[in-house]
Swiss-Prot record:
The keyword Cytoplasm applies. This is Rab GTPase-binding effector protein 2. GO terms for biological process: cell projection organization; endocytosis; protein transport; regulation of cilium assembly. Residues 1-28, 167-208, 371-395 are annotated as: Disordered. Belongs to the rabaptin family. Plays a role in membrane trafficking and in homotypic early endosome fusion. Participates in arteriogenesis by regulating vascular endothelial growth factor receptor 2/VEGFR2 cell surface expression and endosomal trafficking. By interacting with SDCCAG8, localizes to centrosomes and plays a critical role in ciliogenesis.
């Protein structure tokens, strides 16, 4: 009976030991879980710190890249603007230079025209031609009265011949013969042999005096012939006609040869011998052939000149159209450049706005990061103090408290892990957005660079075409000016040659008139100095003076 209670008293001790052992094992397990949770928490803290540092580095890198891109775009824009301004200034200067060149060339053309006018003194030739025409008109004024006097003398001689024939037909009527012979002085007295002509001017020269003297001589011969015939008829009328009267009548009848033998060429014509006339005809035919060939060559040259002028006009039209197209393209390019500058400015403004937003976002993220760090530091400090207190203090006395502590620790670790995951996800989203914005900005920069490069190439091409067009325009203008000067020079030369030929012709006509008048004067003087009627008849029977050949032959 005593042994049984002793066994009953010893039985609770092993149970308590077993219970303590199980609790200690449970506690060690919980402590291990707590240590694992704390280690996991530390790992999560390290991951959070690494993610924060990575986020800060990524944001800083993105910010630096954005700043570099903005700076490069600004530099490119400044370079393009300065280059465009330089090109515009160069084009303006070149345009002013071209205007100055055009003005200078116009002045040179005027100076050349003045020199050409001075080199070809056509005024003096025209004055000489006018003087020659005046001389010919004056000579014509002298010759016309002489011709009238000659016609009057012919009429008088014809009337005298009629009277002589009437006397010869009626030799036995002395009264009527005497009356008819008395009519001769009556018919001669109303009109004198020659009226005094107008005094020739000094410009007419000796030709006018020679013609006037010639006219007086011819009139005196006719009056002498008529007077002699009338006197002989009046003296020997009752006795009939003697041989001397017949000779006088024949002399009177042949006296008409003197005015009839004088051939005065019409104005503008020249007296030439037959051989010279044939030679002149041959030369005229040759000159006609040469003139035809020259006219054909001139027509061909005119046709070529017309074609060249048409080609030049077409080229000028094409060049002007090309210049207008180039100017229009230049204006279009300037508009495109201005639009590109406006777009770049808008993009710069957008980039500045986005940069400002990114800086604000980075600032906000930094503030949040600092807040999180501030939250983590008190929590970690609180946890460290709690751990130290827990370590200092005794462990929970009961398993339920230990379970509660473990559950709370797990919940806190899970909440922190979720918060860190959310933060990491948000940071990843922000990084992706920043990368997308950076890619868009890079693509925009690349497109702007491509547009700028294309515009520069187009500007270079347009400048080259404009330069070539200007060179071609200057060449065509020089050719046109040269052709105009050549035409003007040829016209002036032709005019000079024509005026010289007319002057030589007028001088030759004047010389021929003078020689003819001198020859007539010499023959009249010979008639005046003749002593017998036979000498007068021989002089009158000589070859009539019809042209210059007769003068040369005589």
């Amino acid at each position: 009976m005593a042994a049984a209670p002793a066994t009953l008293a010893l039985d609770p001790q092993p149970q308590e030991k077993q219970k303590d052992a199980s609790e200690s094992s449970e506690l060690s397990r919980l402590r291990a879980e707590l240590a694992g949770a704390l280690a996991e928490m530390e790992t999560m803290k390290a991951v959070a710190e690494v993610s924060e540092s990575t986020k800060a580095e990524a944001v800083a890198a993105v910010q630096r890249q954005c700043q570099e891109e903005v700076a490069s775009l600004q530099a490119i824009l400044k370079d393009s603007i300065s280059s465009y301004e330089t090109q515009i200034a160069a084009l303006k200067q070149e345009r002013q230079q071209q205007q100055q060149d055009f003005e200078e060339k116009d002045r040179e053309l005027g100076h050349l025209k003045q020199l050409l006018a001075r080199a070809h003194p056509l005024d003096s030739l025209e004055k000489q031609m006018e003087k020659a025409h005046e001389d010919s008109e004056k000579l014509r004024e002298i010759v016309l009265p002489m011709e009238q006097e000659i016609t009057e003398l012919k009429g008088k001689l014809q009337r005298a011949e009629e009277l002589i024939q009437e006397i010869q037909r009626r030799p036995r009527q002395p009264a009527s013969l005497h009356g008819s012979t008395e009519l001769l002085p009556l018919s001669r007295n109303p009109s004198p042999p020659l009226e005094p002509l107008e005094e020739p001017s000094g410009d007419a020269g000796p030709a006018a005096e020679a013609f006037a003297h010639n006219c007086d001589d011819s009139a005196s011969i006719s009056s002498f012939s008529l007077g002699g015939a009338a006197g002989s008829a009046s003296l020997r009328g009752p006795q009939g006609l003697s041989p001397e009267q017949e000779e006088t009548a024949s002399l009177v009848s042949t006296g008409t040869l003197v005015p009839e033998g004088i051939f005065l060429p019409p104005p503008g014509y020249q007296l030439v011998p037959d051989s010279q006339w044939e030679q002149l005809q041959v030369e005229g035919r040759q000159l006609q052939k040469e003139l035809e060939s020259v006219s054909r060559e001139r027509d061909e040259l005119q046709e070529g000149l017309r074609r060249s002028n048409e080609d030049c006009a077409k080229q000028m039209q094409v060049l002007l159209a090309q210049v207008q197209n180039s100017e229009q393209l230049l204006r279009t390019l300037q508009g495109t450049v201005s639009q590109a500058q406006e777009r770049v400015q808008l993009q710069m403004a957008e980039l500045a706005t986005s940069h400002k937003c990114l800086s604000q976002e980075v600032k906000r993220l930094n503030e949040e990061n600092q807040g999180l760090r501030a939250e983590q530091l008190p929590s970690s400090a609180l946890q460290g103090s709690e751990q130290r207190e827990d370590q200092d203090e005794a462990l929970p006395s009961s398993i339920q408290e230990l379970h509660l502590l473990v559950q709370n620790t797990r919940q806190q670790a899970r909440a922190r892990q979720q918060a860190q995951e959310h933060e990491a996800e948000r940071l990843r989203i922000e990084i992706v957005k920043l990368r997308e914005a950076l890619d868009e900005e890079t693509a925009a920069k690349a497109s702007l660079e491509r547009q700028l490069r294309v515009q520069r190439e187009e500007t270079d091409v347009l400048e080259a075409s404009l330069c070539s067009l200007r060179i071609e325009t200057e060449r065509v203008q020089q050719e046109q000016r040269k052709a105009q000067l050549t035409d003007l020079l040829s016209e002036q030369r032709a005019k000079t040659l024509r005026l010289q030929a007319e002057l030589e012709t007028s001088e030759q006509v004047q010389r021929d008139f003078v020689r003819l008048s001198q020859a007539l004067q010499v023959r009249l003087e010979r008639i005046r100095q003749a002593e017998t009627l036979q000498q007068v008849r021989s002089i009158l029977d000589e070859a009539p003076l019809r042209d210059i050949r007769d003068i040369k032959d005589s």
